[in-house]
A protein has these predicted regions:
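Short loop/turn motifs at secondary-structure junctions and domain boundaries
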Residues: 1-4
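Beta-lactam-recognizing serine transpeptidase/beta-lactamase-like catalytic domain environment
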Residues: 6, 12-64, 69-171
Length: 171
């Protein structure tokens, strides 16, 4: 990550065992054990990049990492197939005027079928917006619940319960 803020979580792919947590920027914990000057402490404490923040314990919007989840829900509910395509062009789309000025945008137009495979390859926001509408609210929420969203999980550190909405409902 060089000079950027971020975090990594490394887990065993078969067991889910937590192998490593890294938050950057970081600090040298030995400085605390060996004692540090007030100047050093202030430089860590006052750093706008927050090196003492455990970023892996914070809540973040999932962004494009949620696209495979959406695809999996579509496939397991039989709302989507790998062959289903949507028809649209350009980099901006909205369902209808009920969305007001809100548009779904995707970064890069691409040629080829607007299907699940290409949508994952090109991280196509428009495809996944349309797919979610096709899946439907009830199927989508039930699919998330089957994946344990909204449940507390056993974890060696205290973490927030996963959520798919800031309220009790999605529109």
């Amino acid at each position: 990550l060089k000079d950027n803020e971020g975090f990594f979580v490394v887990m065993h792919p078969k067991t889910g065992e937590l192998l490593a947590l890294v938050s950057t920027p970081s600090y040298n914990p030995n400085d605390f054990a060996l004692g540090m000057s007030t100047e050093k402490w202030n430089s860590i404490k006052d750093d706008v990049r927050k090196p003492m923040l455990a970023r892996y314990l914070q809540s973040y919007c999932p962004g494009s990492t949620f696209k495979p989840v959406t695809g999996a829900i579509g496939l397991t509910t039989n709302s989507l197939s790998t062959e289903d395509t949507f028809t649209y062009s350009g980099t901006s789309w909205k369902k209808d005027n009920s969305w007001g000025d809100y548009n779904i945008t995707t970064l890069t137009p691409y040629s080829g079928a607007k299907n699940l495979r290409n949508a994952l390859i090109h991280s196509d926001n428009i495809y996944f917006a349309q797919a979610t509408l096709k899946i439907g609210k009830e199927n989508f929420i039930n699919g998330l619940k089957k994946m344990k969203f909204g449940e507390n999980i056993e974890f060696p550190l205290t973490v927030s319960k996963s959520q798919y909405s800031n309220g009790d409902d999605i529109s």
